Amino acid sequence: MSQLNIHLKLKIVENKAFLTAEKFSMTDKVAYAEGSVVSKIIIRNERGNITLFAFDKDEFLSEHTAPYDAIVQVLDGKAEIIIDGETFELSVGESIIMPANVRHAVVAVEQFKMLLTMIK
């Protein structure tokens, strides 16, 4: 019988480990904190990043721009995503693309979690 060797790449992020061959729930990997926005980087490299966020109700990311397109996927709760002055209300399971170099902001209508993916 041959021996099977399994090698897992380990990503250490904010003192949390993400195994590349491990099943997990996105919503369980980031917790709400009262009066805060919590973020956990899942992957960050020269090609882009994937980050989880948990927003307490009424918390926000102020208006800013990013040099690359980014997609927001709502995992829990509701949020308003403001893109170039237009407001979009998103709920669980909904997504939106924020275009590169266009002003945008994120506001938690209630507690909500999102996955942000930005590819360079």
Whereabouts are the PLM-identified features?
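Short acidic-glycine-tyrosine-enriched beta hairpin
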Residues: 85-100
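A short, N-terminal "cap"/entry segment at the start of jelly-roll beta-barrel domains
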Residues: 1-47, 82
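A cytosolic small-molecule/anion-sensing beta-strand core signal
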Residues: 75-76, 91-92, 110
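Ligand-binding loop in jelly-roll beta-barrel domains
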Residues: 100-120
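Conserved short histidine dyad/triad with adjacent acidic residue
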Residues: 35-36, 50-66
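Glycine- and acidic-residue-biased ligand/ion/polar-headgroup-sensing regions
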Residues: 68-80, 84
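Structural motif
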Residues: 49, 78-80, 87, 103, ...
